[in-house]
Swiss-Prot record:
This is Pseudouridylate synthase PUS7L. Pseudouridine synthase that catalyzes pseudouridylation of mRNAs. The lineage of its organism: Eukaryota, Metazoa, Chordata, Craniata, Vertebrata. Its EC number is 5.4.99.-. InterPro entries: PsdUridine_synth_cat_dom_sf, PsdUridine_synth_TruD, PsdUridine_synth_TruD_insert, PUS7L_N, R3H_PUS7L, TruD_catalytic. It comes from Homo sapiens. Keywords: Isomerase, mRNA processing, Phosphoprotein. The modification Phosphoserine is found at residue 79. One of its GO terms (molecular function) is pseudouridine synthase activity. Belongs to the pseudouridine synthase TruD family. It catalyses: a uridine in mRNA = a pseudouridine in mRNA. GO terms for biological process: mRNA processing; mRNA pseudouridine synthesis; pseudouridine synthesis. One of its GO terms (cellular component) is nucleus. The keyword S-adenosyl-L-methionine does not apply. The active site is at 339 (nucleophile).
Length: 701
């Protein structure tokens, strides 16, 4: 595949730190030429087999009878007071024409079994509320509904009515449900054991789309949460109106229920009537048929493992594992992202899955070029950055001298490696952080998210490349039509992120709010990945400007880290020092101590030309007033400080003559023996091997 020109320009324009000549070569000729092994916080390679037992069946499996049972309220033994429920039946009026239509649950799945359920809820109110409170609650409900029926708006803040404090947790739960069942147009909220009743504004909103009878029944259905039950709205021949109902339900309750349209034949007219049916979403553990041992009440199960993947994008690997285990991608946690075209080993933790269940899918995932091992129970998830670094074993093939270089190739290679080993390399974020798309890079999506341009971010995400393949044909169709449902039918199953966004857009619509919900279909780590891509791009440009402007000298206004032992990006502000004029003149600090801020709300800028450069860039990108928080997507970007130079550790290398290279492929005459370079080294967390190699070779890799 032809390389992306913009991709090359971005990194070719960044300056180097060392002055050696370098050489040409090819990396990642195959995934086995680029092996990445994560180093955990204890300094251990994660591909080493752990000696401790993988898991103990006896500690994980529980018999169903051993589960603690929730205490249930004995509704049958509650005292009943007849006559207090009569007002409820006057609150809802039906027209004669609606009597034959059964909106709400299907007969076999009806929420209200005769009158028993309604009476039971009313009895709970009568039993727990004194007569005065019960009467005041009924009056409050009548007042709210009368105002809505008379089209009178509720002035100011919505009114509320306090039931009072209910200390018993079970009684509070029963009262919450009883009030919502009796008065679906009200909602209840808890405040320190107090139950407060308010108007249900979503009920009123739904009444603008459907009859009040349907709204009343729908909210009763929703509150009852009866497993395997369905709710059906009245037949509707207006497609746009049905679409509005779909979007309302999915926008407000999409995490709980799903909607579908079904055709029903109208016998009198001979035309099909279409109904919108709602049903509760299947729980993840039921989709994956997870055993009872994974649903221990009050205890979240975490299973750690080492993931080996080959030539596979990390997010694609997580999506595949999630499907096989019946969980969602956000249930996986990891310490860092890994390359696609490589063989990588990394630590991961998945929640709500036992070690035994993970071990059961080993054979299935091998077909996807993945393996899992070192499977064991742990107490918590991983967080980004929770690693010491990565070990790399790399083969660089097709070694050649730079153009017009007459020196010996072997000498050039040794000179370059020793130079970087001694002086270090510029600690740029690697190109894999930004994607290799010709038209759109991940940092452009991140900038749109920072500017709260959600729809633009979606369109950038789904912008096709100039390639004729199923993925890009699907993306092209979406940009032309904004038809999420049609695009889903075209998008290949393995494109997990694209399909997640499209499914959400189908549910919520291609609106600003729908696009926000679509971004929420991706795990938090994926959402913030795009924002980090933008802040990483700016940091790369900043460090290049810093070195071009001041070189290796530490000058007034630079920021330096005072703690030599910190080897990650989590420098506290207390460890960051602003270099004074006197300190700069006295050469008190070395260049390897200089740090630059990665954009965020909790950083300080250098007090020299570099600081002004940051402000100019923010102005250029329309972020002068950006607070680096995107509350609509629950993204907070505090920022951090990153050292401008890094050194490879435990570096070793070997030149290897490879007589087979090119001979088999071209059969041409070889004037000199082809060389390959085997190089191994360790890098700190958030450092990139491709960046280190670029400094060594002085050539794009």
């Amino acid at each position: 595949m032809e390389e992306d020109t913009d991709y090359r320009i971005r990194f070719s324009s960044l300056c180097f730190f060392n002055d050696h000549v370098g050489f040409h070569g090819t990396i990642k000729s195959s995934p086995s030429d680029f092996i990445v092994i994560e180093i955990d916080e204890q300094g251990q390679l994660v591909n080493k087999t752990i000696d401790e037992p993988i898991f103990k069946i006896s500690e994980i499996q529980l018999e169903p009878n051993n589960f603690p049972k929730k205490p249930k309220l004995d509704l049958q033994n509650l005292s009943l007071e007849d006559g207090r429920n009569q007002e409820v039946h006057t609150l809802i009026k039906y027209t004669d024409g609606d009597q034959n239509h059964q909106s709400g649950s299907e007969k076999e799945d009806t929420i209200v079994d005769g009158t028993s359920k309604c009476e039971e809820k009313a009895d709970v109110l009568s039993s727990f509320l004194d007569e005065k409170t019960h009467e005041l609650l009924n009056n409050f409900a009548c007042d709210v509904r009368e105002k809505w029926l008379s089209k009178t708006e509720l002035i100011g803040l919505p009114p509320e009515f306090s039931i009072g404090r209910i200390l018993d947790k079970n009684q509070r739960a029963s009262l919450h449900s009883a009030i919502r069942q009796k008065f679906p147009f009200l909602v209840t909220v808890g405040k320190n054991s107090e139950i407060v009743v308010k108007p249900n504004l979503e009920y009123k909103e739904l009444c603008h789309l459907v009859s009040e009878e349907e709204a009343f029944d729908f909210f009763k259905y929703l509150d009852a949460k009866k497993e395997n039950s369905k709710f059906t709205f009245k037949p509707d021949t207006n497609k746009d109106h049905r679409k509005a109902v779909h979007h309302f339900v999915n926008k407000k309750f999409g995490n709980l229920v799903e909607t579908k349209s079904f055709s029903k034949m109208n016998c009198s007219a001979g035309n099909p009537n279409v109904v919108v049916t709602v049903r509760f979403r299947e729980k993840a553990h039921k989709r994956g048929k997870r055993p009872l041992s994974e649903c221990q009440e009050g205890k979240v199960i975490y299973t750690a493992f080492t993931l080996r993947k080959e030539n596979l994008e990390m997010f694609e690997a997580i999506g595949f594992l999630a499907i096989k285990l019946g969980v969602i991608p956000s249930d996986f946690s990891y310490a860092g992202l890994k390359d696609k075209k490589a063989i990588t080993y990394q630590a991961m933790v998945v929640r709500k899955v036992t070690p035994e269940r993970l071990k059961n899918i080993e054979k299935e995932i091998e077909k996807k070029r993945m393996n899992v091992f070192n499977i064991r129970s742990v107490d918590d998830s991983l967080r980004l950055g929770q690693l010491k670094g990565n070990h790399f074993d790399i083969v660089i093939r097709n070694l050649k001298k730079q153009i017009n270089d007459s020196a010996n190739l072997r000498e050039r290679i040794m000179e370059a490696i020793e130079n970087v080993k001694k002086k270090g390399f510029v600690n740029y974020y690697g190109p894999q952080r930004f994607g290799k798309g010709r038209k759109v890079h991940t940092d452009q999506i991140g900038l749109a998210l920072l500017k709260n341009e959600m729809m633009k971010a979606i369109k950038l995400f789904l912008t096709p490349e100039d390639l004729d393949d199923p993925v890009n044909r699907a993306k092209k169709y979406f940009l032309q039509t904004e038809d999420a449902k049609g695009t889903l039918s075209l998008m290949p199953e393995f494109k997990v992120r694209e399909r997640a966004l499209l499914e959400a857009l189908h549910r919520f619509g291609m609106t600003e709010e729908g696009c926000i919900q679509a971004w929420f279909s991706l795990p938090h780590s994926m959402r913030i990945f795009y924002v980090h891509a933008y802040t990483s791009k700016i940091w790369n440009e900043a460090v290049s400007y810093r070195l071009e402007t001041y070189g290796a000298r530490v000058v007034q206004g630079d920021l330096v880290c005072l703690d030599e032992d910190i080897d990650d990006e989590n420098f506290p502000n207390s460890k960051i020092h602003l270099v004074t004029e006197e300190e700069g003149s006295a050469n008190m600090y070395a260049i390897h101590q200089v740090v630059l801020p990665v954009l965020g709300y909790n950083i300080q800028y250098p007090k020299n030309k570099v600081g002004q450069w940051y402000h100019d860039i923010l102005s250029r990108d329309g972020l002068q007033t950006c607070r680096f928080k995107v509350p609509t997507l629950k993204l907070n970007i505090p920022g951090c400080y990153r050292q401008i130079l890094k050194h490879p550790c435990n570096l070793s290398y070997q030149l290897m003559e490879d007589h087979d290279i090119d001979v088999k492929t071209k059969g041409s005459h070889i004037d000199e023996t082809a060389l390959s370079l085997l190089i191994s080294f360790d890098l700190d967390a958030s450092c990139y091997a491709t960046v280190c190699l670029k400094e060594i070779m002085k050539h794009d890799v």
